[in-house]
């Protein structure tokens, strides 16, 4: 199943990044952008939010589900001091649940609709796909941050 392969692949690539040293975690992919540390914490928190949405759609049907303010979470949950191991564990637990439900519901129930408070009507399949896309987009940002440092060293 293609979605399962994509979820596993993006998980494996992301988990390795939680082990970066403090110097690499402090790097950014551009001026004024989040550090790698913040991006990884955000990936973990977003994964928990996406997992909740998936479970709500499967269990409660069509309803409005509210967006979350990523900057408020970064401040309120103090990404600057949060342990990387905590975020890694949150990420892995949420991803395991998402993979489980994707295997059971992506094809069978992917048509189920819900309403995102900012973007409107979406489907369960859309949300599973977003998990992969969101993760991959942020891993690209992390790679850019690490590559910027490597390029500046040469």
Describe these PLM feature segments.
Residues 1-5:
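Terminal targeting/low-complexity segments that flank the catalytic cores of oxidoreductases
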């Amino acid at each position: 199943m293609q979605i399962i392969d994509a979820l596993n692949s993006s998980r494996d690539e992301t988990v390795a990044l939680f082990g970066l040293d403090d110097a690499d975690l402090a790097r950014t992919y551009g001026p004024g952008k989040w550090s790698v540390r913040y991006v990884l914490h955000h990936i973990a928190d977003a994964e928990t939010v996406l997992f909740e949405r998936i479970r709500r759609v499967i269990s409660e049907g069509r309803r409005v589900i509210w967006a979350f303010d990523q900057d408020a979470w970064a401040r309120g949950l103090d990404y600057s001091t949060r342990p990387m191991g905590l975020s890694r564990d949150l990420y892995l637990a949420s991803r395991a649940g998402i993979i489980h439900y994707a295997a059971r519901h992506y094809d069978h129930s992917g048509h189920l609709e819900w309403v995102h408070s900012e973007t409107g009507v979406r489907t369960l399949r859309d949300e599973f796909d977003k998990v992969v896309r969101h993760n991959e987009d942020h891993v690209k940002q992390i790679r850019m941050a690490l590559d910027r440092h490597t390029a500046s060293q040469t």
